[in-house]
């Protein structure tokens, strides 16, 4: 029996508080003045606060043995003609972009990390839409890929899959696996899709740029991106967008979930002008209307929505990222229908994460949690119907989840009859 002790009130909070001190919104508009080459400490950078900190955070995950010591800034500004083609229906003004500045990360042992950070300057007045972009790339792949491997290149994909499987186990992280956070990366890079405008979605891998990379909802996903970066270096022919979505599929399967349909061919857009605006990801403090509206915008019905939410049987909330804290189920690295069972069987009462003040639901012994949006699935009668169905029929859940997640990975992607992705001119 489900007993929710507090009456349900659709809680409206002020916009989400910034919980990650290293990612400050204000830095998005920070003007980066060109100066001579200089060295800046990663840990107290005066100007590149966001860039340096978030990058150092990413890199230090993979390179714990050798934390980055210094960042070298090459601040040369060179006027180069844009390689952006004008849109067919709306010709662009002749574009001049400023060459991005390059930051090389040096390690104590003097070896270069193999990464560099490109910081694109604030937009030129003539290009209204262009924002300052921050992109983390491997040095081996500064030429961004606007075409991924072909759907026929099965052998290459198999090698990438194998490499992804190798990075998933991580005994010193959370519950011993990067699977949940990598799955979340795949979901979030697709969840920006807007079926009404046709933009957003995984194609383009726009999460390499601000404002998407600094969207509050994406806090913590640098862990997943940096874990996959060495794979990108080793297999440069796969695009980030293909790699991140493939990694989501493999994570689900490796955690015991169903086989997710996936095809390659996504491209990486060459700059930040197609980054969707913040605010498209679902907000966990909101109600059923918001869930229906957000998933409806992506093209999902109630059944698909409830099946996708079953992924909350995996992983956990982190107060340092979202402000919420705790796991949904007892087995957070094992894909199952436990989320629905727990949601129905436990008694939930509203409480507060002491350190952040964020409200969430706790079960009786406070070992498990639910977010408001999770609880909304049993408050809303239409959602509740599917929660009950999936709690009783794991096979049905697996089938529905595989279909819905496969659909999620394809949002915004058009393919020809051979399965190859049709080019989106605006990306190049
Ligand atoms: C109403 C929709 C949703 C909301 C509001 C929501 C919100 C959240 C929040 C706040 C977290 C905690 C992040 C952190 O602190 O690290 C989280 C984690 C997670 N979410 Fe969702 N989510 C939603 C839907 C989904 C969907 C559809 C999927 C996948 C299909 C998903 C997969 C995950 C996973 C696997 C984690 C755990 C990540 C980890 O352990 O690092 N979520 N979600």
UniProtKB/Swiss-Prot annotation:
It holds the Pfam family peroxidase. It comes from the Eukaryota. PROSITE patterns: PEROXIDASE_2, PEROXIDASE_4. The lineage of its organism: Eukaryota, Fungi, Dikarya, Ascomycota, Saccharomycotina. Its cofactor is heme b. The keyword Magnesium does not apply. Heme b binds at residue 312. One of its GO terms (biological process) is hydrogen peroxide catabolic process. It is an enzyme of class 1 (oxidoreductase). Binds 1 heme b (iron(II)-protoporphyrin IX) group per subunit. The active site is at residues 188, 328. One of its GO terms (molecular function) is metal ion binding. Keywords: Heme, Iron, Metal-binding, Oxidoreductase, Peroxidase. InterPro entries: Ccp1-like, Haem_peroxidase, Haem_peroxidase_sf, Peroxidase_I, Peroxidases_AS. Destroys radicals which are normally produced within the cells and which are toxic to biological systems. CDD domains: ascorbate_peroxidase. Residues 21-32 have a biased composition (Polar residues). Residues 1-33 are annotated as: Disordered. This is Putative heme-binding peroxidase. Belongs to the peroxidase family. Cytochrome c peroxidase subfamily. The record marks 184 as: Transition state stabilizer. Its EC number is 1.11.1.-.
